[in-house]
């Protein structure tokens, strides 16, 4: 790089930015550096493609985690693995965009600085003005589990998933159902619609005091809400948790109350993460195809980048499936 910098009359840092596809340098300077690198035999495959196609072959992944669970959280870890695998299959790199750095720069500015060709929004507050700015920018954007008009969105069938879980609980004789749902997002609203729709179809009364708002991926909050449900004079026979990870808090609350799942109260999760299969009893849950969601998002974004005139801006629904465990008791009578 030192020789390239000397010949072009720029710093080594500027050469590094040009070779890595970052766009915070002038186009003329960038082009001169890439041509010089090619002449001197320093050209990497990525740099050569960038010179030829005017693309960096770098996908941005916006991941904002308000619960600070990080990429270790099983649901998003699987989604991100799907994005990474599909990107690598198409010879793209990925760069994570998040809010851990200085808030002085917006998500869009961060993306431009990193020189990404497009962005998958994997997890974010979709009402955040910085997210809106990014979605409305010139960059191709694909969202996961949220729909913007005139953009590709990859969504799981949350309404159907919740309907199937309610039907399963009802088939086991349960009619006193409690639901702890996540914060008010598109995902939550769709699951609530599925819950109410299935209960109405099965003529199951829904008690308002048994439908409680929590937060996704928050075992502590679910522990507290579960204790409140168990303290009521008439208890539900089955509690629906917002996700499998949050269920751990509910399980702790049940255990602390001297009760057992499913002998004393039944439980249902959502997501189907590996954790749900190693707890005892195995959790009945709705398994989402998380890797499939990530791969579909990356594939849609790459198609949008490479074929902008023919890409279809549509909603891609990734189906899930019921994972039956041992956490829902068969009641001897329906009440």
Please report, for each region that a protein language model flagged, where it lies by residue.
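N-terminal helix-turn-helix DNA-binding module of bacterial transcription factors
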Residues: 1-57
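Bacterial carbohydrate/catabolite-sensing allosteric modules
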Residues: 7, 39, 82-90, 135-143, ...
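Short strand->helix junction
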Residues: 22, 69, 101, 184-185
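Short gly/ser/thr-rich secondary-structure transition/capping motifs
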Residues: 39-45, 99-104, 251
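Structural motif corresponding to alpha-helix initiation and N-cap regions
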Residues: 44-45, 104-106, 127-128, 219, ...
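Alpha-helical recognition/docking segments in bacterial nutrient-uptake
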Residues: 58-167, 171, 231
């Amino acid at each position: 790089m030192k020789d390239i910098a000397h010949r072009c009359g720029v710093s080594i840092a500027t050469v590094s930015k040009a070779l890595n596809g970052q766009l915070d340098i002038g186009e003329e300077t960038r082009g001169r550096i890439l041509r010089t690198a090619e002449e001197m035999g320093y050209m990497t495959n990525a740099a050569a493609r960038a010179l030829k196609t005017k693309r960096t072959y770098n996908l941005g992944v916006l991941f904002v985690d308000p619960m600070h669970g990080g990429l270790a959280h099983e649901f998003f870890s699987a989604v991100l693995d799907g994005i990474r695998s599909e990107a690598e299959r198409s010879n793209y790199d990925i760069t994570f965009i998040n809010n851990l750095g200085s808030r002085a720069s917006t998500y869009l500015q961060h993306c431009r600085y990193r020189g990404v060709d497009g962005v998958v929004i994997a997890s974010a507050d979709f009402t955040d003005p910085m997210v809106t700015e990014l979605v409305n920018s010139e960059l191709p954007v694909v969202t996961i589990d949220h729909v913007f008009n005139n953009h590709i969105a990859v969504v799981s069938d949350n309404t159907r998933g919740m309907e199937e879980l309610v039907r399963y609980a009802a088939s086991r004789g349960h009619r006193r159902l409690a639901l702890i749902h996540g914060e008010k997002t598109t995902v939550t609203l769709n699951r609530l619609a599925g819950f109410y729709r299935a209960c109405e179809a099965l003529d199951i009364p829904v008690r308002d005091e048994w439908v409680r708002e929590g937060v996704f991926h928050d075992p502590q909050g679910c522990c507290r809400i579960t204790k409140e449900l168990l303290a009521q004079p008439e208890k539900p026979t089955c509690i629906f948790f917002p996700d499998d990870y949050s269920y751990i808090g509910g399980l702790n609350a049940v255990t602390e109350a001297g009760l057992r799942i499913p002998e004393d109260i039944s439980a249902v999760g959502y997501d189907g993460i590996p954790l749900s299969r190693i707890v005892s009893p195995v959790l009945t849950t709705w398994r989402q195809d998380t890797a499939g969601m990530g791969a579909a998002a990356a594939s849609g974004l790459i198609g949008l980048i490479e074929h902008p005139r023919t890409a279809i801006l549509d909603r891609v629904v990734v189906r899930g499936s019921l994972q039956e465990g041992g956490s829902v008791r068969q009641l001897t009578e329906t009440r």
